[in-house]
């Protein structure tokens, strides 16, 4: 079973540094309260850690 992560943008990127805006965009998030699903891997975890104060993460077990 592969783990997946549901990532939701909970805070706005307005007024945030450019590198944080780019990271949020790279995760596939464009609008507030939008949720995307990604495979759990070190690259995605690193991006989440960089913008942890802007997103909410939920682990999903795939069957």
UniProtKB/Swiss-Prot annotation:
State the InterPro entries in the record: Ribo_uL30_ferredoxin-like_sf (IPR036919), Ribosomal_uL30_bac-type (IPR005996), Ribosomal_uL30_CS (IPR018038), Ribosomal_uL30_ferredoxin-like (IPR016082)
- Into which family does the record put it? Belongs to the universal ribosomal protein uL30 family.
Looking up Gene3D superfamilies in the UniProt record yields:
Ribosomal protein L30, ferredoxin-like fold domain
Q: Which UniProt keywords apply?
A: Ribonucleoprotein, Ribosomal protein
- Write out the GO cellular component annotations: cytosolic large ribosomal subunit
Q: Which domain of life is it from?
A: Bacteria
Q: How does it assemble?
A: Part of the 50S ribosomal subunit.
Q: What is this protein called?
A: Large ribosomal subunit protein uL30
Q: Which GO terms describe its molecular function?
A: structural constituent of ribosome
Query: An example of a Gene Ontology BP annotation on this entry?
Result: translation
Check the record and name the Pfam families matching this protein: Ribosomal_L30 (PF00327)
Organism field? Geobacillus stearothermophilus (Bacillus stearothermophilus)
Entry annotated with the keyword Zinc-finger: no
